[in-house]
């Protein structure tokens, strides 16, 4: 009986949400989140870019992801040389190569887009998820930590996150990253890195930078 009551309650809540979607918002919450984040980042002088969903194996190798890398088994391959992107970073590196030659520094860009991984770490992971990646490149090295914290605060505030933590964590791609965690349940909301970084060499990039990737569904 208790289960039936709970089920009835949850069904009622979901129907109310659907009715609210139709009568009030008329846009999915994730879409509204994207708009809020896009608007605030543009206001803060970041430029939105859009890159392809299909990624070449060559670009993955530039991220040190080869056939022996742990992430390889999580990739959705379309053929032997192309896959659905597991991350936004490779194409953003490619875009930054050109922008650094054309624009005055610092160069500030961001992208919001779908990424795909065969995740195997429980119910909190999905094969398709929406990432926000923002990068500021060409700033002074001594300002990196401060700027990273400013960007983390900007995004979390826009997303309505009232309590979060920043801590160091190991990464299969970057070696070590700085994670942004929900202050209540320690769920990872985003992951940040700073350069110069060893991965920069493959893209002929030498500038100091900060970058953060957020999972929008988690925000």
Language-model segments: residues:
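TRNA-recognition modules of translation machinery and tRNA-sensing kinases, especially anticodon-binding
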Residues: 1-219
